[in-house]
Design a protein with these regions (language model features):
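A detector for small-residue-rich transmembrane helices and their helix-helix packing motifs
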Residues: 1-146
Length: 147
């Protein structure tokens, strides 16, 4: 996910702001996990919450970008191009479903971190978008192509 979506966000924000954005969303993701699942005894490790923040930013900045999606069922497979708001909207919906289903079972995946990272990415990029430099850069950037 970072490879597919991260480069567009980095290009829009610039390297320094991207790194700050990445660590901030990762911090909010960890905080969300700690608040929403305070009794968890499973250690939290990884970058998925920060990457979820990148996905949230991508949804805000490039909702109409087409993402290549590979569908496979037994011997049938096909590659579709689907708009980012559908792909990422579906992804966050699955995170909410998984969190609610696994809330009592504690399945070892930090779904609350994914949700918190995604939401913080949406909020932070909207705050940063209000800066004129970011606005101009977004308007000049064409809709990115999927890799």
């Amino acid at each position: 996910y970072l490879y597919i979506f991260g480069d567009n966000i980095e290009e829009t924000l610039g390297k320094t702001k991207f790194i700050i954005f990445y660590f901030l969303t990762g911090g909010f993701a960890a905080l969300s996990q700690a608040i929403l699942d305070p009794n968890s005894t499973i250690p939290m490790i990884g970058a998925s919450g920060a990457i979820a923040g990148i996905l949230g930013a991508y949804l805000v900045l490039f909702p109409k970008a087409k993402i290549k999606v590979f569908f496979w069922f037994i011997i049938f497979f096909k590659i579709f191009k689907i708009k980012a708001f559908i792909v990422l909207g579906g992804w966050i919906f699955i995170q909410f479903l998984s969190f609610s289903h696994n809330y009592l079972n504690s399945g070892g995946v930090a779904y609350a971190a994914h949700i918190g990272g995604f939401i913080s990415g949406v909020v932070l990029i909207n705050l940063m978008k209000n800066k004129t430099r970011i606005k101009r850069k977004i308007s000049r950037t064409s809709v990115p192509n999927s890799k």
